[in-house]
Amino acid sequence: RGSSGLYSGASSAGGVKTCPSEIEAGKILPLRMSWEDDWANYGVEENSVDVAAASRSVITHDLEDSLQKLSAVACEKVCVTVGTGFSPRVDMRVARAMGLELERHNDALFVFGIASDLGYEPTVSYIHSPRTKSYISPDEAYHSLLRTRDYLADTIDQISVEESACRLRNFLADHLVEIEEDGTKRWALDQSRVVPWAFISWDVRV
């Protein structure tokens, strides 16, 4: 699940006007609002924060409008984190072992391109986030990882469900190991998967 945030420092020309005392005290003020809402109704007005950030939440039905909203409320900078290809929910080592071709959406290209078209000069760096998922049993691991098929590319002929399931069982026989987690026996793959993210930012004062 993604998140969005608005930061206002001591040098800011403004703040989130619904509760400035909370901002001054260094507290977090949660606001439940969507990309489609009028943010001004929540006190988030134009040039009201120093930095506007969206982590894994900005890929919406109208990406350009979302990026414009972030840029409008920020006095200095916008920062977003988005995916670079395959779904972060899948382990590509498992997908390859199963013989699957998965759908790919490089959201970073769209964000970078739209920010450039809006007149900004975006920069990009990459975050490689290791993740380890554990399971209560080998059977749970098998059924959970079998859902890798939910992310199949629909333009490519794929191997059968039966064949990919057989390959998965063979893969787990070699790579699923017993671990201890909080004093309880669990099961996990012998290598953590690494999820790549693109961190894209731009100065709104260009």
Which residues make up each language-model segment?
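A short SAM/SAH-binding and catalytic strip from SAM-dependent methyltransferases
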Residues: 36-65, 71, 84
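Acceptor-substrate binding/catalytic loop of class I
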Residues: 96-108, 133, 154-158
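Conserved Class I S-adenosyl-L-methionine
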Residues: 123-206
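Class I SAM-dependent methyltransferase SAM/SAH-binding core
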Residues: 1-42
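Short alpha-helix
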Residues: 103-125, 148
